[in-house]
From Swiss-Prot:
InterPro entries: Ribosomal_uS15, Ribosomal_uS15_bac-type, uS15_NS1_RNA-bd_sf. It comes from the Bacteria. One of the primary rRNA binding proteins, it binds directly to 16S rRNA where it helps nucleate assembly of the platform of the 30S subunit by binding and bridging several RNA helices of the 16S rRNA. Forms an intersubunit bridge (bridge B4) with the 23S rRNA of the 50S subunit in the ribosome. This is Small ribosomal subunit protein uS15. GO terms for biological process: translation. Part of the 30S ribosomal subunit. Forms a bridge to the 50S subunit in the 70S ribosome, contacting the 23S rRNA. Keywords: Ribonucleoprotein, Ribosomal protein, RNA-binding, rRNA-binding. One of its GO terms (molecular function) is rRNA binding. Signal peptide: none annotated. It comes from Rhizobium meliloti (strain 1021) (Ensifer meliloti).
Length: 89
């Protein structure tokens, strides 16, 4: 259900801008996307889980804020990131 430590390390390695980078917007958005995808799969079986759905909306909002920040600061990095993650915008 949640993102395992191994999967998180793999995501960090893939999207990090420098070695040991865990706080860049790219890494944060990638981890949030993984969590959002996991929750989306959860809702296919548990349609009435409104408590978790509220958490999903919070994750989507956080991701949107980070993406808006990245687009404002560096549009090339933003475009590359949404292409790599398959996020439509």
């Amino acid at each position: 259900m949640s993102v395992t430590a191994e999967r998180k390390a793999q995501i960090i390695k893939e999207f990090a801008t420098v070695e040991g980078d865990t706080g860049s917007p790219e890494v944060q958005v990638a981890i949030l996307t993984e969590r959002i995808n996991n929750l989306t799969e959860h809702f296919k079986d548990h349609k009435k889980d409104n408590h978790s759905r509220r958490g999903l909306l919070a994750l989507v909002s956080s991701r949107r804020s980070l993406l808006d920040y990245l687009k404002k600061k560096d549009e090339a990095r933003y475009t590359k990131l949404i292409g790599a993650l398959g996020i439509r915008r």
